[in-house]
Amino acid sequence: MPIIYMNITLAFIISLLGMLVYRSHLMSSLLCLEGMMLSLFMMSTLMALNMHFPLANIMPIALLVFAACEAAVGLALLVSISNMYGLDHIHNLNLLQC
């Protein structure tokens, strides 16, 4: 396995561990989720470049579109929760209390 693939896999694992450790605040969770999406984007781009198949280039673009949608929804949720409760704690997302 080349060193670049190991670095990208390590970045994904570190972001995943950050998601598990810093799950009390929504902003920290969103940043870790963006790190995971960035490492997946880099991995899919490298795989598409190495495959030399023209139709494989659409996968990184689709992943980038989904990451942008996820970021927009996450930030809208963060603004809504911080306006409603004044904090960005994850435990405020309990649907039974709304």
UniProtKB/Swiss-Prot annotation:
Q: A Pfam family in this protein?
A: Oxidored_q2
- How does the protein's chain sit in the membrane according to the entry? Multi-pass membrane protein
Q: Where in the cell is it found?
A: Mitochondrion inner membrane
Q: Which UniProt keywords apply?
A: Electron transport, Membrane, Mitochondrion, Mitochondrion inner membrane, NAD, Respiratory chain, Translocase, Transmembrane, Transmembrane helix, Transport, Ubiquinone
Q: Which GO terms describe its biological process?
A: ATP synthesis coupled electron transport
The UniProt entry's GO CC annotations, sorted and at most eight, read: mitochondrial inner membrane; respiratory chain complex I
Q: Which reaction does it catalyse?
A: a ubiquinone + NADH + 5 H(+)(in) = a ubiquinol + NAD(+) + 4 H(+)(out)
Q: What is its main location?
A: mitochondrion
Family, per the entry?
Answer: Belongs to the complex I subunit 4L family.
* Biological role: Core subunit of the mitochondrial membrane respiratory chain NADH dehydrogenase (Complex I) which catalyzes electron transfer from NADH through the respiratory chain, using ubiquinone as an electron acceptor. Part of the enzyme membrane arm which is embedded in the lipid bilayer and involved in proton translocation.
Q: How does it assemble?
A: Core subunit of respiratory chain NADH dehydrogenase (Complex I) which is composed of 45 different subunits.
PANTHER family linked to this entry: NADH-UBIQUINONE OXIDOREDUCTASE CHAIN 4L, NADH-UBIQUINONE OXIDOREDUCTASE SUBUNIT ND4L
| Protein name per the record | NADH-ubiquinone oxidoreductase chain 4L
The species is Piliocolobus badius (Western red colobus)
Gene that this sequence comes from: MT-ND4L
